[in-house]
Amino acid sequence: MSKKITIYDLAKTLGVSAGTVSRSLNDHPSISMKTKERVISMANELGYKTNKFAVNLSKQKSNTIGVIVPKLNSIFMSTVLAGIEKIVNDAGYNLIISQSLESMEKEKLNAKTLYDSGVDALLVSLAYDTSNFDHFAHYIRNKIPLIFIDRVHNLPNCSTIIINNRLAGFEATEHLISLGCKNLLYVGGNIKRNVYLDRLEGFKDAMEKHQLDFDQTHFLETDLSPDDVDSVIHYIKSMKNAVDGLFVSSDNFAAHIIKALKRENYKIPQDIKIVGFNNDPISDLVTPTLTTVN
């Protein structure tokens, strides 16, 4: 096995100090261009490899960005992550991706692990049940950039990246109303999360604009998981006025609901018209195809 070349080997070969070699490799302004070129040429010739970890440590940088997302099996989140990774890699950074599995406790653990790893920044889409944000305090205190995406929370000196969920909810609901729906139901997630609350507000805005009554019976909060489908069907069947329009905050969940409604002999869209959210590929795979918000 060949011996690993060090800056001391380079210094000895070139007849200069180890400090000169180090400053040359780090493009220090005190070193002449001629010396830098000589050092770099010899480094390449001998196969010297920079210890990036040591260099970054001295600069208090890891060239790594952390991301915490609820789940990796979401088409929407996978698309977001692909975009993040491309931008991060193009900028010379690496990406560490972790998932909270919709658990605040797992999110806390992930945040600590990434902090201990020395990430230069953290991007977070909050877990379903996150109600306390103390696990991000170290980032804020130490001025490590903290950015919330999609599912966000407003913390001091932190950025947020979101779409206009309220407008999206309004347009989805208005589409159903334009098709003649008058007794609508919004099936959303935990309204502690901004995305589901904002879509609910948009739903209410559309109802109000078209002078349709809204009360709490027009909103059903769920986990948006297949396990909740039966309870949604039961709720629809129990409503005093027959539901004729359904706005569901997830294409995947909407697809499961369509399947269950058809099993109960509902005709889609004749009996109930349905709009989903995210423009997931599954919207084209169900029968009939699902109208969805992109």
Q: Predicted regions span which residues?
A:
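Amphipathic helical "hinge" segments at domain boundaries
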Residues: 46-121, 201-204
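Short beta-strand segments enriched in small/hydrophobic residues
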Residues: 13, 18-23, 57-73, 175, ...
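Short beta->alpha connector loops
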Residues: 48, 101-104, 127-131, 252-253
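N-terminal helix-turn-helix DNA-binding module of bacterial transcription factors
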Residues: 1-62
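Bacterial carbohydrate/catabolite-sensing allosteric modules
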Residues: 1, 45, 86-91, 112-118, ...
